[in-house]
Amino acid sequence: MNKESRLSKRIEDKFEVVTYLDRLKYAIESGSVKINFQKNRRVDEERDRKYTNRYTMAHLFPDEDEVEALKRELSLLTVEDYIETVKDLRFPNYSEMRVFGKEYVNEDVYIKIRVELLNTTHVAGDSFILVMSFHFA
């Protein structure tokens, strides 16, 4: 199965994106979710270093805690930054990923996140926001 065939993509309407962003901001501000940032990814081994999560975070936020910077930047996303919603068909029980694009220092940054809000009374572990991509485009 190639990469494209295992993904289902769609564009959400403005109301859905606004609702998603409101819930994302609430989750971040409440402190009830963890931020899991994929700083090192296998796909980055084949990429120009400039387009990796590690490089982008170090370049944009050199003197900041990465998690705190991500919390702030995710909270600042707007409906205008939204690109698409993606479902990885290999993992049907995982929530959809949202893709955003935002400009920093005159360069586009590709942001892909997945929010998993787990009910801890039924599942071991905490709710989390997985930041899969935060890199120059």
Regions found by a protein language model. Give the residues of each.
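Compact soluble domain cores
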Residues: 2-15, 19-94
